[in-house]
């Protein structure tokens, strides 16, 4: 069954205009795209909320809807106006009238003095597992932007700009969704409200030129994926001549043997069943070579042991992480006659007769007595 406009706004059918307005404000805030970016369900609900309000806030449309339903509003001159809501001159005014200067028209129009380029930028640097753990030197090639001196970063010939014809100098254009129009940055002038009547021949209208450079970087020991290293004064060059920074984002490869978790290293190490039963000192690999692990008697499959300070050095201090060794007990898959005979004798020495251990026999007896009781 189709949900009614009153249910969409969570109000009763006899609600007055003020109640409808308050309900709309509440629901529009809840499902507004700016607060639910990437949420398709919220976007659909936002459209329904606007559709419901457009009808219920209009006395004529509401009367027709109450009497004949939604279908009666289709066609017949009762559709929404070309702007989504009539009577609001500036884009986003529908929201500013309800919510103040927090939505739509409150977006600051950019100034022609604003930079077309950010001062800082990020480059990705891929490292091997060992390079990230132990540090290394890397030569990084990169491209940076420099504000065009010919046009002073405007992108216009001789630096002269004219009012943007698409947004009429507002820096915003309207985009309709359902029954509402909201503002977004003008794609032609990027929100400045002005654009070049003739492009600068030097930068081709971009407002900046690109140059290539390289730098040798000392990668510290212990970096990991997602960490950023700042390289001072290697960013973009702005109109006033100041230069930003370049940030190098680390992408560290994984290893086939070792698993890294921050500064700790994990490894699964195979142990023969006799070693686990009898206990033994064994050699295990570490990121720096090998270390001795003293297995206790009766070690269990999946049991973990900590080798202190055998992990990765913390990138911000001298603290060392640990290595965690998880043992995996292995059993022989084939036996020769001598091995089979030895194991059979061992089995008998533990009291296993007729295919059953004494503990298993005791359990069966308990279950049998349970059925008899």
Swiss-Prot record:
Binding site for Zn(2+) 2: 164, 167, 186, 189
Any one annotated GO CC term: cytoplasm
Subunit structure: Homodimer.
Cofactor binding mode and count: Binds 2 Zn(2+) ions per monomer.
Zinc finger (CR-type): 135-212
Organism: Campylobacter jejuni subsp. jejuni serotype O:2 (strain ATCC 700819 / NCTC 11168)
SUPFAM superfamilies linked to this entry: Chaperone J-domain, DnaJ/Hsp40 cysteine-rich domain, HSP40/DnaJ peptide-binding domain
Occurrences of domain J (ranges): 4-69
Name by which UniProt lists this protein: Chaperone protein DnaJ
Record's keyword terms, sorted: Chaperone, Cytoplasm, DNA replication, Metal-binding, Repeat, Stress response, Zinc, Zinc-finger
InterPro entries documented for this protein: DnaJ (IPR012724), DnaJ_C (IPR002939), DnaJ_domain (IPR001623), DnaJ_domain_CS (IPR018253), HSP40/DnaJ_pept-bd (IPR008971), HSP_DnaJ_Cys-rich_dom (IPR001305), HSP_DnaJ_Cys-rich_dom_sf (IPR036410), J_dom_sf (IPR036869)
Domain comment quoted from the record: The J domain is necessary and sufficient to stimulate DnaK ATPase activity. Zinc center 1 plays an important role in the autonomous, DnaK-independent chaperone activity of DnaJ. Zinc center 2 is essential for interaction with DnaK and for DnaJ activity.
Main location, first listed in the record: cytoplasm
One function term, GO molecular function aspect: ATP binding
UniProt-annotated binding residues for Zn(2+) 1: 148, 151, 200, 203
Function comment: Participates actively in the response to hyperosmotic and heat shock by preventing the aggregation of stress-denatured proteins and by disaggregating proteins, also in an autonomous, DnaK-independent fashion. Unfolded proteins bind initially to DnaJ; upon interaction with the DnaJ-bound protein, DnaK hydrolyzes its bound ATP, resulting in the formation of a stable complex. GrpE releases ADP from DnaK; ATP binding to DnaK triggers the release of the substrate protein, thus completing the reaction cycle.
């Amino acid at each position: 069954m189709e949900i009614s406009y009153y249910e969409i706004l969570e109000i009763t059918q006899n609600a007055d205009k003020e109640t409808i307005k308050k309900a709309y404000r509440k629901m529009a805030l809840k499902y507004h795209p700016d607060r639910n970016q990437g949420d398709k369900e919220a976007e659909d609900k936002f459209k329904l909320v606007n559709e419901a309000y457009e009808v219920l806030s209009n006395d004529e449309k509401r009367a027709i809807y109450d009497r004949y339903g939604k279908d009666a509003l289709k066609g017949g001159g009762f559709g929404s106006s070309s702007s989504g809501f009539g009577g609001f001159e500036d884009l986003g005014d529908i929201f500013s009238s309800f919510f103040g200067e927090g939505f739509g028209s409150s977006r600051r129009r950019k100034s022609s003095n604003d930079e077309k380029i950010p001062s800082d930028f990020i480059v990705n640097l891929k490292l091997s597992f060992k390079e990230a753990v132990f540090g290394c030197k890397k030569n990084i090639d990169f491209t940076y932007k420099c504000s065009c001196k010919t046009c002073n970063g405007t992108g216009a010939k001789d630096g002269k700009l004219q009012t943007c014809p698409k947004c009429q100098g507002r820096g915003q254009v309207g985009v309709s969704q359902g029954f509402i129009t909201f503002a977004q940055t003008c794609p032609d002038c990027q929100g400045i409200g002005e654009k070049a009547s003739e492009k600068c021949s030097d930068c081709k209208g971009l407002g900046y030129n690109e140059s290539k450079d390289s730098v040798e970087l000392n990668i510290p020991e212990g970096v990991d994926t997602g960490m950023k290293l700042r390289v001072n004064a290697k960013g973009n060059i702005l109109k006033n001549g100041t230069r930003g920074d370049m940030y190098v984002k680390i992408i560290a490869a994984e290893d086939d043997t070792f698993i890294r978790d921050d500064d700790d290293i994990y490894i699964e190490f195979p142990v023969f069943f006799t070693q686990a039963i009898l206990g033994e000192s064994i050699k295990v690999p570490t990121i720096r070579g090998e270390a001795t692990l003293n297995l206790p008697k009766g070690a269990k499959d999946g049991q973990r042991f900590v080798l202190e300070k055998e992990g990765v050095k913390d990138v911000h201090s001298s603290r060392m992480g640990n290595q965690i060794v998880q043992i995996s007990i292995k059993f022989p898959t084939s036996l020769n006659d001598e091995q089979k005979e030895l194991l059979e004798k061992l089995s008998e020495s533990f009291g296993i007769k007729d295919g059953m251990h004494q503990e298993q026999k005791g359990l069966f007896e308990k279950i049998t007595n349970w059925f008899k009781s």
